[in-house]
Structures are given as structure tokens and as C-alpha cells.
Amino acid sequence: MTLERLWQVLDPLWADPRVLSALFCGSAMAVVLLKRLGHRRIQQKMEEARRARDLALERMEKAARRFKQENPGTQTAHILSLTMVELAEKLKEGSLSPESVLYSYMGKALEVNREVNCVIDFIHGCEDQLQKVKQQKEKGLLYGIPVSIKDHIDCKGHVSSAGLVKFLGQVKEEDSVIVQVLKSQGAIPFVKTNIPQTMINYDCSNLIFGQTLNPLNHQKTPGGSSGGEGALIAGGGSLLGIGSDVAGSIRLPSSFCGLCGLKPTGFRISKLGVISPITGMNSVIGMLGPIARDVDSLALCMKALLCEEMFRLDPTVPPIPFDEEVYTSSKPLRIGYYEEDGYFQPSPSMKRAVQQTRKLLQEAGHTIVPFAPPKIDYVVDELFTRGIFSDGAAHLVDSFKGDIVDPNLKSQFNTYKLPALVKRILAIILKPIYPRIARDLSALCGVGSAKNLWDQHTAVGLPH
């Protein structure tokens, strides 16, 4: 009866074009207003995050200034000039104090940040960690070494944002495993660094904390997605940083900023306590790893990380310690190399670096063998790109819900969110003219079924 009465009231109204027009206009206005309100809430959250960062950096600056005033004789320039290995030795022997090193790097990090906008948070617990380190019975391999941490790696009492609004306000209750291990080895995590929104980008910008610049050339990007790490370390504000890498996110910032970086073998380091906008990816394995100024620093970091504490905290990590004998061995090796892979065009500087490295290795007694990577188009398009976007980029697109897309990501995001059918049609149209773009579009459609996903896992894991 109620429905019948409602229909009796509404029935004559549907026939009136003025009513229909008013309903349509009202609905459209409601949609616009809701969208504006949503954007306003997003902007408010971002402003709150920026205020929190500014307050944290003010606290950091006060701490660094206070130490400098109380210890005017601190040899800051000397401390900042030392390599990580040299600094570790001086800290262990006691000729330098952990306080002098930490506050020297805090001051330098602030200076670098003012130039290139690379630091997004001060890990205030570093001062407590400083006291704990001094009380450790055995000095760890990273005793007193300040370490910078990429944004999305959890630190107790801090937010891991991934450059996305949806993660703001989620203060972590405990450290990630890698941060716990660093602390157990005497390291002092002291700042978190900037990243691009979602981290699937080779620049370093997000709408929350802004654009990070390359300290070597402010007109250039530091690379991504561990761009904040690259910028801070290259600017001298950190000795050692922990980044992450799926498709070059450690290696590219290292290259762009003149540093050394390592993406370890998959599952070599625990990823417990690390957030990501893409989950469930098994064909292409992302990994945490170090960025530093030289190879010896990377080796020291890996030696410290691959310890019993890591294996205890995360039993899924293979309990294989760093092999010092292999690392220090002078036994001649047989090493393959190539200057071009047939897919990516190398710059002249890249070719020159390969040639110089080849020459040095030959002079050291190693056998250097040229080779061409096999099936490069198939590997890049079908295994790598389709492996990252097996779901047709659905997880990545979903991560932007309730957020605003960074202008630097607009074209990338618009491609991801195209329906699979549209991507396939565009791939067919573009194939005769731009075959590589066509293959990329096809790969972005994903694998399509569980069977295809399993087939792809097999193709990645087994040579054929």
C-alpha cells in the first residue's frame, strides 16, 4: 500500500519536464558538492601531515642546535668527511662518540633538506636509541651509525604513507623487522625520506610532501622511488639509507645521484613491517636494500643485516649469513657483460661505465665474456611488466581511491585505469606504428586468469 501511494504521488511528477530537469540539476550539484567536500577533506589531511613534518623537523633542529652549543669543539667537518667503514672503526675504538656523529648528521640532514626537500620525518626515538646503544654489552657492526629510512618502512611511533592520503594518521606501533635488526646492530635510524606517490615511478614527488630535487643538479630528479634516500645521501646528510626496489627503485636513485645501491636477491631480507600499494605480486619480487656512498658500506650493511636476529624475527628469511670468504676472495671469476640489451637505449655515460669496469676487471685477472640477454622483448613485456601488473593494475588504481593523483603521475595513472578492452584495442591499432607501446599496453591488461598467472610463475621460475 505504501509503495502504491508513493507511486500515485510521483507518477504525475515524472511527466513534468521541469521536475525532471530540477531533479537532474540537483543530482549533478550534489555530486559536485560531494566531490569538493571529499577533496577538501583530502587537502586537510595533507596539511595536517605537513604540519606534523614541520614540527618534527623543528624538534630535530632544536636537538642538533642544543648539542652544538653544549659541545662547541665537535669536529663536525671531520666526522662528515669519513667513509662509513672509517666512521664505524672510530666509533668502536672510542675516538668518536655516537652523540657527536648523530647530531653532526642531524644538522647536515636539515641543511640538505632545506635545499632539496628529501626528509619527511624526524625519528624522535633516535635519542633513546642513542642511549641504548651506549649501554649495549657488545658493540654491533653498525655501532653508532646514523641510518635514514625510506618512508614506507615502519618505524615505531611514525607514519608510513607511501605518498598516499589513505595511510596518513596510521601511527605504527612497532618497528619493521629491518629497523629492529639495524638497532640490534647498534645503528641509529634518525630520519624518514620522501618517495613518489605509490612508489611506482622513477621521479620523487607526491602531493603530501612535494617534489624532491637532485642535490647534484636541482633541475634534475634524484630518481625513484627511493629518491629521498638518494638525495639525502648524495647531499651528505646520511651515510647509509635503507630503500626498496622492484624495478630499479634503489638502483636508479643510486645511478642518478652518483651512489652505490644494492637490490638483494628476493626474500634475502625481511619485508615484515613494510607497506605497499601493490600486494600479492610474486612474479617480480620487490626487496629492501642499502644505499651508500661506496661498495664497502653496502657490504658492511649486508653483513650486519644477515644475522641471527633477522632469521629469528622472520623465519621465512633463509638463514644464510654474509659470506665474508667469498666477498674477500681474490679468486679469478668468469663475468658476463653487455653494453646494450636490445631493449633499453643506454646513455653514452652508461656505456663508458661498463667499458671502464670491464677494463678494471680484466686488469684484476678476471675473464670477461660478452653476451646478449636472450628473449629480451619477451622477458620485459611478458614476464616483467605483465608480472608487476598481473591484475591489470587493479590494486594500483584502487590505491588512489579517496586520493588526488599527483600531476607527475597523471598520464601514467590514466593509462593504468583504462579498461582492458580499450587497452587491447589500442594495442592492435598501435602495433604497426609503435610496436613497443602496443606490447606495453597489452602487458598492462594483466594475465586474465588464475591459470595464466600460474603459467607465468612457472615461466619466471623455470628456464625454457
UniProtKB/Swiss-Prot annotation:
Active site, renumbered: K150 (charge relay system), S225 (charge relay system), S249 (acyl-ester intermediate)
One GO molecular-function entry: amidase activity
SUPFAM superfamilies listed in its UniProt record: Amidase signature (AS) enzymes (SSF75304)
Q: Which domain of life is it from?
A: Eukaryota
**GO process terms (BP):** fatty acid catabolic process
Entry's InterPro entries? Amidase_CS, Amidase_dom, AS_sf, Endocannabinoid_amidase
Keywords on record: Hydrolase, Membrane, Mitochondrion, Mitochondrion inner membrane
Reported tissue expression:
Kidney.
The listed locations are:
Mitochondrion inner membrane
- Please give the GO cellular component terms listed in this UniProt entry: mitochondrial inner membrane; mitochondrion
**PANTHER family annotated for this entry?**
FATTY ACID AMIDE HYDROLASE, FATTY ACID AMIDE HYDROLASE-RELATED
Q: Which family does it belong to?
A: Belongs to the amidase family.
Q: What does this protein do?
A: May have a vitamin D3 hydroxylase regulatory function.
**Protein name from the UniProt record:** Vitamin D3 hydroxylase-associated protein
Q: Which organism is it from?
A: Gallus gallus (Chicken)
